[in-house]
Curated annotation (Swiss-Prot):
The lineage of its organism: Bacteria, Pseudomonadati, Pseudomonadota, Gammaproteobacteria, Enterobacterales. The keyword Cell wall biogenesis/degradation does not apply. Residues 86-205 form the GST C-terminal domain. GO terms for biological process: response to hydrogen peroxide. GO terms for molecular function: glutathione transferase activity. This is Uncharacterized GST-like protein YncG. Belongs to the GST superfamily. Beta family.
Length: 205
């Protein structure tokens, strides 16, 4: 069985949602506190020297990291969780899958730990990065239609990102006021019976 090393509510939530949608069994291993010295960090370091979550230990003992790579792995088993090959939605799915981790993810690295990157002006860095993140979400919102999911009636793995990331900064109210498509998609995903246990355990709902 796959082991998902993560922290409730963090990026590992996205992987949990993907695996749950795909009916792939897994065991969650809580490594809360991994971002500081201690037992959790030492455990995670033995699997992933970069000490990032999610880190997945697969059935064959190989290690998988990076949520976009995990999504591609899931699609090998459940291709129906992406738009069909040959449709325009497929290209947008591929683009947004990479865009999210290449553009939005780094803003959390800098805004969550600003003192690491700008020790002389951490609050200014945090403020600037959060404003930049908002501009990214506004662009992303313009690419989506929420009918009811990111690519229409078909639920895809990109929806797992939107559902989870809405709970991170700048928060639910901001999305409701400024990124209504993202907010509506997240609401639709949060209503899926299949995901209730994972969503509650990760305090998404």
């Amino acid at each position: 069985m796959i082991k998902v090393y993560g922290v409730p509510g963090w990026g590992s939530t996205i992987s949990e949602l993907m695996l749950t949608l795909a009916d792939i069994p897994y065991q969650f291993v809580d490594v809360s506190g991994f971002d500081h010295e201690g037992a959790s960090r030492e455990l995670l370091k033995t699997l992933n020297p970069l000490c990032q979550v999610p880190t997945l230990a697969l059935e064959n003992d190989e290690i998988m990291t990076e949520t976009a790579a995990i999504a591609l792995m899931v699609l090998d088993r459940r291709p129906d969780l992406a738009p069909p090959v040959g449709r325009a939605e497929r290209q947008l799915f591929q683009r947004l899958l990479v865009w999210l981790v290449a553009n939005v993810y780094p803003t959390f690295t800098f805004a969550d730990y600003p003192e690491r990157w700008a020790p002389d002006a951490p609050e200014q860095l945090k403020k600037n990065v959060i404003e930049y993140r908002k501009s990214l979400y506004i662009w992303l919102n313009s690419q989506l239609t929420a009918e009811p999911y990111a690519f229409g009636e078909q639920l895809t793995l990109v929806d797992c990102y939107l559902c989870t990331m809405r709970t991170w900064g700048p928060g639910h109210e901001w999305f409701q006021d400024n990124a209504t498509n993202i907010s509506a998609i997240a609401d639709a995903v949060c209503q899926l019976p299949k995901l209730q246990e994972v969503l509650k355990r990760n305090e998404i709902i």
